[in-house]
């Protein structure tokens, strides 16, 4: 990725009230985006958001900027990120904009864009928007100003889209499911999708108040879901993150099922049904157990850089239709254009219903290697800790000790000043010790 001033790996993100997530910046961003994107004739932009309290302020600022550039805004209200991608396509809009910081706490927020075809904006377009932001705002003539309106049936449209990805001949009537919506954008979508497909649904994390998004609930913290699945004796649990582009599951025994395992289940089922084309794309963080399990099935596997945009790029490069991150981003190009937690979860449920198998049994063909991840915060602008000789030396020692039976991955977060230290191998105690040894070296820099 080229050096850009504002856009990171997943749009623009930060703490609300601090640059760049301020009303004046977002207004100018809306204007600059309008200038760059107003080229296809519809002059409409879809704007969706998650349930953060700051979404009201930021959508108003975006709308003002777009209107000044002559584009009209169509508001969806709280809506999952993949729903905005879908609605952008179906409305033939110039673009879709999502106001969300995904799995981050409520005091963060962000802006990300979708192209007219429902895919994330290419780097070149983001760079063009940044270049436009260096100019002074100019307002179009009064008669050409944009308008604002709401899509009153946005939720219903997306619910029907999700249900259409589930086979007509199957039902969820035999399943008791706990669904955790992270007090986020899926709160009024996912429970209804599952109920309408016949499931007995117990909903948690479905009472957003503007400040409780991702707070001890959702895909990034499944403890509440695990406890509820066990207490209710449910068949499984499904957790989404704040904006609904991630899914993590829990089996009837309370075991966490991550994005690697979800992709394994979907890929294997696609192979069984004769629908899998090509291979599967993971990331540098994908578990070695996934790679080995797919190879045993004869399914090619390749790793992309971390980030769902890079998974998608690799999928397009290979002509493959399935990719995922272990964090729960699952991209199924035969179904949609971006990571969609609800759609991915439905494909796992279809495999359960079709084969009359539990989630636990569907995972049994894949042995997960212990994988320890330690996040180390560093001071932005103080140099690259990964280039320090002491960090390189400790990393080399660990890699030599693991040999071919494990891996080490050090990388910077694309959205926060964090170094992510990942060590993977056969022995959990050993990889834990190795991960903390490297993390200590990073902290000491």
Curated annotation (Swiss-Prot):
Domain of life, source organism: Bacteria
Database matches in Pfam families: PGM_PMM_I (PF02878), PGM_PMM_II (PF02879), PGM_PMM_III (PF02880), PGM_PMM_IV (PF00408)
Cofactor (UniProt): Mg(2+)
CDD domains the UniProt entry points to: GlmM (cd05802)
Cellular-component GO terms for this entry: cytosol
Binding residue positions for Mg(2+): 102, 241, 243, 245
Signal peptide stretch: none
Modification after translation (UniProt): Activated by phosphorylation.
Active-site residues (renumbered): 102
Binding note for cofactor: Binds 1 Mg(2+) ion per subunit.
Keywords: Isomerase, Magnesium, Metal-binding, Phosphoprotein
Catalyzed reactions: alpha-D-glucosamine 1-phosphate = D-glucosamine 6-phosphate
Stored SUPFAM superfamilies: Phosphoglucomutase, C-terminal domain, Phosphoglucomutase, first 3 domains
Matches recorded under PROSITE patterns: PGM_PMM
EC numbers for this chain: 5.4.2.10
Membrane-traversing stretches: none
Single Gene Ontology BP annotation: peptidoglycan biosynthetic process
GO molecular function: magnesium ion binding; phosphoglucosamine mutase activity; phosphomannomutase activity
PTM sites of type Phosphoserine: 102
Role summary: Catalyzes the conversion of glucosamine-6-phosphate to glucosamine-1-phosphate.
PANTHER family for the chain: PHOSPHOGLUCOMUTASE (ALPHA-D-GLUCOSE-1,6-BISPHOSPHATE-DEPENDENT), PHOSPHOHEXOSE MUTASE
Family note: Belongs to the phosphohexose mutase family.
Name the record gives this protein: Phosphoglucosamine mutase
Gene: glmM
């Amino acid at each position: 990725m080229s050096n850009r001033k504002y856009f990171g790996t997943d749009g623009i993100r930060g703490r609300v009230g601090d640059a760049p997530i301020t009303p004046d910046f977002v207004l100018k961003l809306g204007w600059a985006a309008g200038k760059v994107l107003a080229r296809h004739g519809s002059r409409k932009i879809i704007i969706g958001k998650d349930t953060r309290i700051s979404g009201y302020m930021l959508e108003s600022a975006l709308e003002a900027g777009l209107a000044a550039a002559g584009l009209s805004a169509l508001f969806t209200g709280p809506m999952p990120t993949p729903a905005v991608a879908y609605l952008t396509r179906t409305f033939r809009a110039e673009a879709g904009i999502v106001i969300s910081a995904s799995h981050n706490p409520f005091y963060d927020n962000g802006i990300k864009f979708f192209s007219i075809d429902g895919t994330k904006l290419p780097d070149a377009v983001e760079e063009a928007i940044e270049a436009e932001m260096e100019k002074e705002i100019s307002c179009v003539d009064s008669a050409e100003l944009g308008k604002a309106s709401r899509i009153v049936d946005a939720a219903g449209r997306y619910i029907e889209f999700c249900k259409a990805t589930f086979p007509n001949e199957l039902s969820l009537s035999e399943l008791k499911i706990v669904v955790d919506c992270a007090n986020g954008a899926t709160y009024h979508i996912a429970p209804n999708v599952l109920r309408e497909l016949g499931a007995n649904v117990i909903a948690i994390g479905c009472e957003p108040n503007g400040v409780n998004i991702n707070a001890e609930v959702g895909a990034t913290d499944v403890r509440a879901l695990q406890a509820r699945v066990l207490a209710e004796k449910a068949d499984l649990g499904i957790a989404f993150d704040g904006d609904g582009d991630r899914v993590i599951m829990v089996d009837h025994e309370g075991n966490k099922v991550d994005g690697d395992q979800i992709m394994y289940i979907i890929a294997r089922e696609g192979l069984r049904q004769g629908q899998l084309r090509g291979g599967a794309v993971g990331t540098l963080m994908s578990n070695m157990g996934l790679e080995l399990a797919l190879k045993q099935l004869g399914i090619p596997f390749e790793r992309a850089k971390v980030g769902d945009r890079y998974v998608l790029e690799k999928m397009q490069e290979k002509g493959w239709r399935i990719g995922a991150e272990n964090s729960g981003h699952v991209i199924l190009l035969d179904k949609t254009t971006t990571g969609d937690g609800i759609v991915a979860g439905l494909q796992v449920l279809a495999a359960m219903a079709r084969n009359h198998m539990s989630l636990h049994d569907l995972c049994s063909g894949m042995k997960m290697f212990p994988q320890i991840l330690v996040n180390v915060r560093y001071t932005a602008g103080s140099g690259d800790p990964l280039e320090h000789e002491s960090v390189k030396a400790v990393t080399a020692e660990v890699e030599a000790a693991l040999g071919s039976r494990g891996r080490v991955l050090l990388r910077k977060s694309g959205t926060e000043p964090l170094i992510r230290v990942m060590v993977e191998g056969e022995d959990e105690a050993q990889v834990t010790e190795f991960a903390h040894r490297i993390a200590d070296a990073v902290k000491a820099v």
